[in-house]
Amino acid sequence: MESTAYDAFQEGCRLLANASPHAAVVALERARDLEPDKGSIRETLGRAYFRTGRFAAASSEFSRAVEIDPVNDYALFGLGLSLLRVGDRSGARRPLKLAVAMRPEMDAYRDALSDAE
């Protein structure tokens, strides 16, 4: 039986929730290849890459998620964190400032922005 993007996405989410980010990457890459313009898939794949230490790949996926959905505060946050991890503090500031502006109550967003400044 051929896997649909939704099935692969659900599998990836389950694996990520069960602390199996490497396995989640495989499922989520399959979902992304089937539905490359789904922001939720791109964001979740970014989270999986981040949790496996693949920060450049994570920033690429979070960036694409933001292109698809510019008001996705979590994708902006993930993009900023990923850029911080690859040493791009100046590049991290803009997405983190936007994430904080959208969700000022999120301590993690404000903390990450402080780290970037």
What annotation goes with each model-predicted range?
Residues A17-R30, T52-R64, V86-L98:
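Structural signature of tandem alpha-helical TPR/SEL1-like repeats
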Residues M1-D7:
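TPR-adjacent "capping" and linker segments in tetratricopeptide-repeat scaffold/adaptor proteins
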Residues L81-A108, S114:
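TPR/TPR-like (Sel1-like) alpha-helical repeat modules
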